[in-house]
């Protein structure tokens, strides 16, 4: 008997954790039901599939009870078109909500709010009589959030929840030739929402593909493919377990079941490698006999080509179901990779080799389409990861779109497949995992994931979920996986990352050398962890290096440890992409939004933006740091006479057959000697390369650097030709300096001019009155204020060059890492920004303590002392000595003394606002991208030139940005600065960055703001909620000195 809509809704299935589905078919790998072997082998589109993607009719209600009963049979008058797949919140209905830990609904499991946003979808489609003449028709929803009911032609079909796994239903009894109508009622909240508390945008709707699939009456029901390699990896067995759907009344009739045959053909491109055919049936399982609806086929393969992320060689297995006349009923096909995953002697090994995981966590996210991801976006992520030396990705924190795994198989990425389970907002987190009434809901999310995805070679580890504590359910599901798929290890971080439910120590945000002894679940340093008594598992960080905004400091320390300790086998960076959504302001202009921008409450503001790439996949500077730290070639300088380097390949399987070594000896950013040669390295091998017999003799003084890089001359499936995969730089010892005759002649030529300059001492003039001190040289005049003691103006030809005077700067626009977990409603006194606020660093009162002028024989010297205090407490003392010489240069020596009561400042430097705006910035120092004292592994010393706008890093949440470290020369327009300093140059002041909430709200200011730092604190990045700048990168001394030389070229 068909139930009415009110009767169905009255059961409130979405508030019953023991009801996760009605009439949903069992999980299995993706099916295509090809009707010819060639199409299956070549992976052609299957005529048995019909997409239902496109425009659907959509009506929105605030709660399911408000849906009119007749909607299941016909569209409502107010219905409007809505694309599928899509999140309805991005099409004007309801609002996306971003939260990290806290649930977006009151925590009362399994209850959810009565006001439960509901989307009513419907679509008509047409089926020919031939489609319905025989067989069965299924409908497959690849992803619907969070729960839904399905009707076909007015009749209720079923119910499902779990947003991230397919829901498949048999539509055969409800279909008719011609026009058909399906209706889907989607609930935003369900008891399943309590298991989906991931750190992400909470959105709803049919956000993955929908399609019809036609299967024969007798058809393949499940296929499980495993590869087993010999100890020497010289041969392999391909094991295929296949089950067939046969009517139950025929299962015990051997004449019926035995008439069906299963055939497996293994192809390598167009070459048939092996084939095996046998009838249905297994060996006797117990005293009642065998299975009659399934069989096991084993093919032996000699000298198989192995699959790895480095060499993702794929075979193609075609599984055919044949009738008693040997005619094909249907075929399914899967890519097969021969590879072995094992933990042996404390090491995770791929094909017998200990692997170093160069991993990243990735949410399915697109700034325009939210959680609806297309193939182009999937492929873009994979190519970028491969190009930046990633070899692994964790599906955080749910099973991904089915196409993701196929692409990872083909392009070569190791995958941690993770169940769609997180209960982070529960107290305790294990509240539900220890509750038997929730066992079914937990278990289906794990078992169905395994059943869908287990044929993919890219998946090397199963994960039981994320941040859900540790309960009896986890132990049970761990054992289920180990029984049903003994070919892969299982990891689970909950409960301390080292419970019996994990084969791998997989902590998150454990530090290299620092213990975090939390009472319940201590996080030891990763070096200490692997040395604990009776602990022999490998350690792979499931999350580390929190890349939130201007972050990622100290990342290189992890990689030093990974390479030093074999059982530290890498980790997964948090995370890949800034989870910002495109929003529009009142004028219709787009901008990248974060939590709260949609009026969503509760929200966790900008905590959704932790990516190595911006939402449009353009790189953060931290991406280059990851690329360099993770590069597969390591370099060492053995000698300089002759010039010899050693290169080690960290590839486990591939030869360096597409690599060219390029080297250059650089003098102050200019090449003086260079060369290239092919790189011929076997896996895991080292080789010495003799680059030159000796260092070149120089005809001018300067510092020599040796730059080496490895490029790939030919394009690959994942990279263009000349892709740079690795690089390094060394500072070389100073060679002999032998001035050339040209230089000698040049000196002689300019000697009269130099002599003339010596005679122009009267051009350096000094004027003083009660308000100002002026130093004049030719067309330039430096004007000091006696009141402030500061350089108030720099005149050139009576034109003012400064919009704001030159002064000390000790603060920066707070980084996310500086802010930590401090916000309006919660203050973390340990956060750097709170320590600086409490100390008064943002409200310093400056006083000029003294001002002295000396007119020397060849220069004018002005000495000034400044005191900085807060609430009458002296905090900083700054002593500046300005020297003006007869060449129009201003040299400043700065000495800063810091009170012992003051927390370490963010910077010791100076700033001013220049009147000039020049299109280009040139410098000799570290570059070309933004770098900071604890994030400069990827930067190289050289001569760089960039447009002014590219000197600003457009972090969505504005903060300190754009620094370039270890600079010796800066040229900006007619300005030249020399010394040993860091600098940042921008159209935005520190003050504007501090008070502006979004990048798009920044307004270019008049002129240019120039920040010159003698010293700058690191940015940190082990995590973003506790102080994570390493002690070596904190300004802890009591005194600091630096010197800058300024010149304006008139």
From Swiss-Prot:
GO biological process terms on file: lactose catabolic process
One GO CC term on file: beta-galactosidase complex
Chain positions recorded as Mg(2+) 2 binding sites: 603
Note accompanying the cofactor annotation: Binds 2 magnesium ions per monomer. Binds 1 sodium ion per monomer.
Sequence positions that bind Mg(2+) 1: 422, 424, 467
InterPro entries: B-gal_small/dom_5, Bact_Beta-galactosidase, Beta-gal/glucu_dom_sf, Gal_mutarotase_sf_dom, Galactose-bd-like_sf, GH-type_carb-bd, Glyco_hydro_2, Glyco_hydro_2_AS
Binding annotation for Na(+): 199, 607, 610
EC primary class: hydrolase
Pfam families per the UniProt record, alphabetical: Bgal_small_N, Glyco_hydro_2, Glyco_hydro_2_C, Glyco_hydro_2_N, LacZ_4
Keyword terms: Glycosidase, Hydrolase, Magnesium, Metal-binding, Sodium
Family, per entry: Belongs to the glycosyl hydrolase 2 family.
Subunit structure: Homotetramer.
Protein name, entry field: Beta-galactosidase
Gene: lacZ
């Amino acid at each position: 008997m068909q139930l009415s809509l009110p009767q169905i809704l009255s059961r409130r299935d979405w508030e019953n954790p023991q009801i996760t589905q009605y009439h949903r078919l069992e999980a299995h790998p993706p099916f295509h039901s090809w009707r010819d072997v060639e199409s299956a082998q070549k992976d052609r589109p299957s005529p048995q599939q019909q997409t239902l993607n496109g425009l659907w009719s959509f009506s929105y209600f605030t709660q399911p009870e408000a849906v009119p009963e007749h909607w299941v049979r016909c569209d409502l008058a107010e219905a409007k078109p809505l694309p599928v797949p899509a999140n309805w919140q991005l099409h004007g209905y309801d609002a996306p909500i971003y939260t990290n830990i806290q649930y977006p609904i009151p925590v009362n499991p399994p209850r959810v709010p009565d006001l439960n946003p509901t989307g009513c979808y419907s679509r008509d489609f047409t089926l020919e009589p031939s489609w319905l003449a025989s067989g069965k028709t299924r409908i497959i929803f690849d992803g619907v959030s969070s729960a839904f009911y399905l009707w076909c032609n007015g009749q209720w079909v079923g119910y499902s929840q779990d947003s991230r796994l397919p829901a498949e239903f048999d539509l055969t009894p409800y279909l008719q030739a011609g026009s058909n109508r399906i209706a889907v009622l989607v609930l935003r909240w369900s008891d399943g929402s309590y298991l989906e508390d991931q750190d992400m945008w909470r959105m709803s709707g049919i956000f993955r593909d929908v399609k019809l699939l036609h299967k024969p009456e007798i058809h393949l029901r499940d296929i499980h493919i495993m590869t087993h390699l010999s100890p020497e990896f010289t041969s392999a067995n391909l094991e295929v377990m296949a089950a067939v759907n046969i009517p139950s009344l025929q299962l015990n009739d051997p004449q019926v079941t035995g008439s069906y045959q299963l055939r497996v053909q293994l192809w390598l491109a167009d070459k048939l490698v092996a084939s095996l055919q046998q009838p249905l049936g297994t060996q006797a399982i117990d005293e009642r006999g065998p299975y009659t609806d399934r069989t096991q086929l084993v093919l032996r393969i000699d000298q198989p080509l192995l699959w790895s992320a480095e060499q993702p060689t794929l075979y193609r297995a075609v599984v055919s179901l044949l009738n008693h006349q040997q005619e094909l009923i249907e075929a399914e096909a899967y890519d097969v990779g021969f590879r072995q995953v094992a933990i042996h002697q404390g090491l995770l090994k791929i094909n017998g080799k200990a692997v170093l995981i160069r991993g990243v966590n990735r949410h399915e996210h697109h700034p325009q389409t939210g959680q609806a991801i297309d193939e182009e976006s999937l492929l873009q992520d994979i190519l970028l990861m491969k190009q930046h030396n990633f070899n692994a990705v964790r599906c955080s924190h749910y099973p991904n779109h089915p196409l993701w795994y196929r692409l990872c198989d083909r392009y070569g990425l190791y995958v941690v497949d993770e169940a769609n389970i997180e209960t982070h907002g529960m107290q305790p987190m294990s509240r539900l995992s220890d509750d038997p009434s929730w066992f079914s809901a937990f278990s289906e999310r794990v078992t169905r994931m395994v059943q869908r995805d287990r044929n993919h070679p890219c998946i090397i580890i199963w994960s039981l979920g994320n941040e859900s504590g540790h309960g009896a359910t986890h132990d049970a599901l761990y054992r289920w996986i180990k029984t049903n798929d003994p070919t892969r290890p299982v990891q689970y971080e909950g409960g301390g990352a080292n419970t019996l439910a994990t084969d791998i120590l997989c902590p998150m945000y454990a530090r290299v050398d620092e213990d975090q002894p939390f009472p319940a679940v201590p996080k030891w340093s990763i070096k200490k962890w692997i040395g604990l008594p009776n602990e022999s598992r490998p350690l792979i960080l499931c999350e580390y290096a929190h890349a939130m905004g201007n972050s990622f400091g100290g990342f290189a320390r992890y990689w030093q440890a990974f390479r030093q300790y074999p059982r530290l086998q890498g980790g997964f960076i948090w995370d890949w992409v800034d989870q910002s959504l495109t929003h529009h302001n009142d004028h219709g202009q787009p901008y990248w939004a974060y939590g709260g921008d949609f009026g969503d409450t509760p929200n966790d503001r900008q905590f959704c933006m932790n990516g190595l790439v911006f939402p449009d996949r353009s790189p953060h500077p931290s991406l280059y740091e990851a690329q360099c730290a993770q590069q597969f070639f390591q370099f060492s300088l053995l000698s300089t006479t002759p010039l010899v380097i050693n290169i080690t390949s960290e590839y486990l399987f591939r030869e360096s057959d597409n690599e060219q070594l390029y080297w250059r000896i650089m003098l102050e950013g200019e090449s003086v000697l260079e060369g290239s040669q092919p790189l011929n390295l076997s896996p895991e091998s080292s080789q010495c390369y003799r680059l030159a017999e000796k260092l070149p003799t120089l005809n001018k003084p300067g510092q020599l650097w040796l730059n080496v890089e490895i490029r790939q001359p030919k394009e690959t499936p994942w990279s263009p030709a000349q892709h740079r995969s690795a690089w390094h730089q060394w500072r070389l010892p100073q060679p002999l300096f032998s001035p050339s005759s040209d230089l000698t002649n040049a000196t002689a030529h300019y000697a009269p001019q130099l002599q003339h300059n010596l005679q122009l001492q009267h051009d350096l003039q000094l004027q003083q009155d009660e308000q100002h001190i002026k130093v004049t040289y030719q067309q330039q005049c430096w004007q000091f204020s006696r009141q402030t003691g500061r350089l108030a103006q720099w005149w050139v030809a009576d034109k003012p060059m400064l919009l704001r005077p030159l002064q000390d700067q000790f603060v920066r626009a707070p980084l996310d890492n500086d802010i930590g977990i401090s916000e309006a409603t919660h203050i973390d006194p340990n956060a750097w920004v709170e320590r600086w606020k409490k100390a008064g660093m943002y409200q310093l009162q400056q006083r000029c303590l003294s001002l002295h002028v000396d007119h020397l024989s060849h220069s004018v010297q002005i000495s000034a002392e400044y005191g900085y205090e807060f609430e009458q407490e002296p905090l900083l003392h700054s002593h500046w000595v300005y020297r003006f010489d007869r060449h129009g240069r201003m040299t400043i020596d700065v000495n800063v003394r810091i009170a012992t009561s003051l927390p370490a400042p963010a910077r010791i430097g100076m700033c001013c606002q220049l009147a000039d705006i020049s299109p280009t910035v040139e410098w000799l120092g570290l570059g070309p991208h933004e770098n900071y004292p604890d994030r400069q592994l990827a930067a190289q010393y050289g001569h760089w030139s960039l447009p002014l706008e590219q000197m600003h890093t457009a972090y969505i949440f504005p903060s300190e940005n754009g620094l370039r470290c270890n600079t010796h020369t800066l040229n900006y327009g007619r300005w030249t600065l020399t010394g040993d300093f860091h600098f940042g140059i921008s159209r935005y002041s520190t003050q504007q960055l501090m008070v502006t909430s979004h990048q798009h709200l920044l307004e270019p200011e008049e002129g240019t703001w120039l920040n010159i730092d003698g010293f700058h604190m690191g940015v940190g990045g082990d995590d973003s909620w506790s102080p994570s700048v390493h002690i070596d990168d904190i300004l802890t001394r009591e005194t600091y000195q630096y010197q800058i030389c300024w010149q304006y070229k008139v």
